[in-house]
């Protein structure tokens, strides 16, 4: 049988550029091949979802799941625990070359266990086992090399096969302790637990040991030096945890799916990081542009700067005035860079926003909160809304999960970090929306109706 031949382009990640391990291999497949993969991927997804085969909180590469849904769920669990006055430890796990180490036989065995068989299984076996690849860099090709393992990175089908491969991690980690929290975005995995004493810490350590055993059984490995633990709670006893004999490094803050999460759940660490980066990009734009007309500056700001300030914002939207102002300062600076309209410089910030027909970042985050709420309540986010929100009961329905007009109820809280968390801070704004907006038939309709409601 002729082997499938793949060309691989190395994409730099971080670290030293002269080390091959710091590059990610991306498959340069043809368009027909990608179309074929997309068709098969869609059918596999339908099969997995119709049979409820995806275990636990996997948010990667799935419709209705995202970095935002992952982070919102994570911070919901942690802030709720802290509001109850308990400590919480979370280990952020780093798999070593996760996609590259998936063994063919293990992946195919798990695909079969998920009900994939027959001609599709034969196709998958040919697609995975019978291939060779070479690196293409600056027009130069390396020699062909047989591929002995790995899910094809940069492919359409590879990610869903990887999800199938690690799908049973939750069962392994929660087998002896249902209180263990497991959250995944592809291979980015978090395991956590309330830890109020040595016995709780021992249970979390047992979970970590189970993860190490799972990795050994299935040909994967962890990177102990890149795993970190966050000790949440002012009275946290900060127990030590180990991967084999390697102590997991405790951190005050850690970057998770693009968001810096601190052990106090304070948003300032994240705001400081992203505003510093955004100001740096603005400086590059200033140096690179000669003609700073309105169209050019606004296009570059919206493309390269504003996304840095809004990624997964529902999970970290700040309530401290200093953080809010620090974010707004970036947009104020961007608008001052417009040089083709001298009248803008003389206007107040509010009038500049009206003239340019844009919102303040604070208002945009409110809109983002409401949009995310709409997605949760209407099934666009594939997460049970009752996991996050509380509702006013519908007195005319016998259904205990029925709610009247999606009317939300805020929790009684003791800490500001919980009071201003997404599910509580959005309550009043959501309840104040007209029914016509809340009952919009689609996401785009909701956006348009909301913008009309606030006069945009």
Where are these regions (language model features)?
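Conserved pre-catalytic core of RNA-dependent polymerases
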Residues: 1-152
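Short linear motifs embedded in intrinsically disordered, charge-biased segments
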Residues: 322-456
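Short, conserved micro-motifs composed of acidic
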Residues: 206, 221-253
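Catalytic palm active-site di-aspartate
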Residues: 5-8, 24, 58-60, 88-98, ...
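Basic, alpha-helical interaction scaffolds
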Residues: 246-314
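Catalytic palm subdomain of template-directed nucleic-acid polymerases
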Residues: 98-114, 189-213
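Short, conserved catalytic/metal-binding micro-motifs enriched in Asp/Glu and His
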Residues: 1, 24, 40, 94, ...
């Amino acid at each position: 049988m002729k082997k499938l031949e793949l060309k691989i382009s190395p994409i730099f990640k971080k670290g030293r550029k002269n080390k091959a391990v710091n590059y990610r291999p991306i498959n340069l497949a043809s368009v027909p091949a990608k179309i074929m993969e997309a068709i098969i991927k869609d059918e596999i997804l339908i099969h997995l979802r119709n049979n409820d085969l995806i275990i636990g909180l996997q948010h990667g590469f799935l419709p209705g799941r995202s970095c935002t849904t992952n982070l919102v769920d994570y911070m919901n669990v942690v802030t709720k625990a802290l509001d109850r006055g308990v400590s919480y430890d979370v280990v952020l796990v780093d798999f070593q070359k996760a996609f590259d180490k998936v063994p063919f036989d293990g992946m195919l065995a798990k695909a079969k266990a998920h009900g994939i068989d027959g001609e599709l299984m034969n196709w998958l076996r040919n697609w995975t086992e019978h291939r060779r690849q070479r690196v293409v860099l600056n027009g130069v090709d390396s020699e062909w090399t047989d591929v002995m393992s790995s899910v094809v990175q940069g492919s359409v089908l590879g990610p869903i096969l990887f999800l199938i491969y690690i799908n049973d991690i939750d069962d392994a980690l929660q087998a002896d302790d249902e209180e263990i929290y497991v959250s995944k975005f592809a291979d980015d995995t978090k395991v956590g637990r309330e830890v109020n004493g040595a016995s709780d810490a021992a249970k979390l350590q047992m979970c970590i040991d189970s993860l190490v055993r799972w990795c050994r059984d299935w040909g994967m490995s962890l990177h102990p030096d890149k795993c970190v633990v966050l000790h949440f709670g002012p009275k946290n006893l900060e127990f030590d945890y180990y991967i084999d004999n390697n102590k997991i490094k405790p951190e005050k803050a850690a970057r998770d799916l693009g968001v810096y999460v601190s052990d106090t759940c304070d948003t300032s660490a994240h705001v400081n990081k992203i505003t510093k980066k955004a100001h740096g990009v603005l400086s590059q734009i200033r140096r690179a542009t000669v003609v700073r007309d309105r169209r050019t500056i606004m296009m570059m700001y919206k493309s390269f700067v504003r996304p840095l300030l809004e990624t997964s914002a529902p999970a970290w939207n700040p309530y401290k005035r200093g953080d809010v102002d620090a974010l707004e300062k970036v947009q104020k600076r961007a608008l001052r860079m417009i040089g083709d309209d001298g009248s803008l410089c003389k206007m107040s910030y509010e009038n500049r926003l009206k003239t340019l027909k844009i919102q303040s970042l604070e208002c945009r985050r409110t809109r983002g909160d409401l949009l995310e709420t709409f997605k949760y309540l209407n099934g666009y986010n594939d997460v049970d809304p009752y996991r996050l929100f509380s509702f006013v009961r519908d007195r005319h329905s016998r259904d205990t999960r029925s709610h009247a007009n999606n009317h939300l109820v805020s929790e009684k809280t003791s800490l500001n970090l919980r009071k201003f968390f997404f599910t509580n801070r959005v309550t009043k704004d959501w309840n104040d929306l007209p029914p016509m907006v809340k009952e919009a038939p689609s996401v785009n309709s909701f956006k348009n109706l909301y913008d009309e409601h606030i006069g945009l």
